[in-house]
């Protein structure tokens, strides 16, 4: 509770956000205003969470948008009487910190903790309603001990394994990347390096065990953006089809298995294509063919990020089509991927666009086996026919609809053992090994006698060593640290070595939301009872770029830990909001391709490059140092205040859309808050002076106030924060126009209501003006107002008047008029008399509140 002696006198009529915001932030902290209430059950809880930040050192506007959106939602729910959990932490492990530490010659721990301290102070400037008592960083030993604990839980459940595999290697960061961390151009998600392939022994999690549930349960996520669900659906990539086994004529002991979703086209297969690394290639003896394949490998490696030519190499290998015993040549093709399916595909040129192009280029037969309707004749195709139809050239299946033939041919194959039904996923197991120091150590000991042995949970944590050399040329800093790496086997007791790989940072962020409800729990990762009370997260806010990394991994972790009986929830995040980017004007010289700093441009309305006088293109792009278009949040807060920054961020664009920074828009919000300030300063001086009261003004203000309550409440619930602020502005206009013309009770009620409605958006000024008009408790401890539906009723309505069914006029009618009064008012109107004069009115039909029809 905020006591009266904590109030401050206002010495100036000018709005001074710096003074106001510092004052209230201090008082809120002192009074533990945002400490989370204890929950007895989960009926009145609301868990609001932003994706926690990586401590890069400085807050940027993208951060501000994320945290302000979540804060608004958390504050609103607290006003609605919910017990709100709104925590904050730090995603602190990872390569950026390690690389920054190497550059500066300091430890990643020192670098990270310094950045956390600075960013926390910046976040506090925003006036967030965060419960800082629950704060943690993933690099804290008392956090990552539980990441190791959960790793062992997954190990016991059979979800962790190690294997040697070809992996994505980042040559700049010297570490392995998961498939999800390689972009569509084959580049590292972080360093931007061209990713290479390397053979290493790695640790994996069996996320594929949950592929079907992860896919199916997307249907439960009604409050997730559709595009995020589509991205996850595509990434999981479920295909229901058939594995077809082709015998190899030249090598009877061998079989070539091909996955297909189109067994109905099996009679149209005129070639099979395999990848450059397929195991069958070992059976090719012709040296010229082998050399061509080697050349193709080099071409693929060199051009992996470019559009590939459809290159084919015909081999001496011949397969046998199981449906008709016809020979099929086997080709090595540039478009076949090692990692998808079996590394081999059927070539059906007549009914696949890619196969048609490949066949035309390489002079391969094209055999049509599906026609649009039965009356069509077999003819030479100008392009692949990819629609449904009826089979031809397919023996006993001729004339059968291809959708039916698909099932029948598959059934024949299963019965005759040359096919099996198969469900296939694009999703691959999650590779979690990283060959760097600054990550969570993997709690495994490598013993020459026992192999890889998991530690007992009582032996945790495996702490990172502090005496470590992580200079730039060190590939395996942990392995080279003899004091740390040498240990004894927990199984047999002989000399052994600790695992020197660390975990992917996404391991730490895949469960952090489970820690907050019991963040101080000393002997387990979380209290089950607290998880079952607080989870799932009611509102999660973060960038769409995490759709197939963090969000998919977090869903997997939740399901896997549920199956280990650690809690009962199925999904971690009930409602997801993916905010758009914050963009600002960037000035680009299209001749040089370089960006020019605005500070170097004389006239921003007609920008030219000061070096070569070229006219610059103005682009709105994501803020970045390289484009000279970053806006420092601290400088904005210093100049205009946090409340102005918050109002701008929330008003400028709907939260899911990209937001374009504009100084004039920021100034507009500052002026709006200044007008509010001036109104309340004047009201504070005259709050007890009786006003003249005018019924019409009072009625209008009551109506405006109730409209504002209703619309702002609905807008916040629907994440339409920009329109909520528009409604707030309308209410302000009504309030300022009538404040001196209404009775004192209504004046106080309206001023009080406006304060509460403003508070989630601009919490500091709302608190200050609340106390200016005489209230002692914090405005943030108030209840959200309810609207009065009666006050929203109109005095009159528009009545449509028809004569013989045709609209002739529209008239405003008071609600209290009866039918006789309505007739008396309307029948003598000139526009109606024009159509009824000298005519017999046979009937008048009135549908009150809507329409009146005069039949003449």
Curated annotation (Swiss-Prot):
> Which catalytic reaction applies to this protein?
tRNA(Leu) + L-leucine + ATP = L-leucyl-tRNA(Leu) + AMP + diphosphate
Which processes are annotated in GO (biological process)?
A: leucyl-tRNA aminoacylation
Residue ranges annotated as motif 'KMSKS' region: 622-626
The text of the family note is:
Belongs to the class-I aminoacyl-tRNA synthetase family.
Name the NCBIfam families for this protein: leuS_bact
Q: Per the UniProt entry, what species is this protein from, by scientific name?
A: Prochlorococcus marinus (strain MIT 9301)
Q: Which InterPro entries does the UniProt record give?
A: aa-tRNA-synth_I_CS, aa-tRNA-synth_Ia, Leu-tRNA-ligase, Leu_tRNA-synth_edit, M/V/L/I-tRNA-synth_anticd-bd, Methionyl/Leucyl_tRNA_Synth, Rossmann-like_a/b/a_fold, tRNAsynth_Ia_anticodon-bd
Q: Which Pfam families match?
A: Anticodon_1, tRNA-synt_1, tRNA-synt_1_2, tRNA-synt_1g
Q: Which GO terms describe its molecular function?
A: aminoacyl-tRNA deacylase activity; ATP binding; leucine-tRNA ligase activity
Q: What is this protein called?
A: Leucine--tRNA ligase
Source organism superkingdom? Bacteria
Which keywords label this protein? Aminoacyl-tRNA synthetase, ATP-binding, Cytoplasm, Ligase, Nucleotide-binding, Protein biosynthesis
Motif 'HIGH' region is found at 53-63
Its Gene Ontology cellular component terms are: cytosol
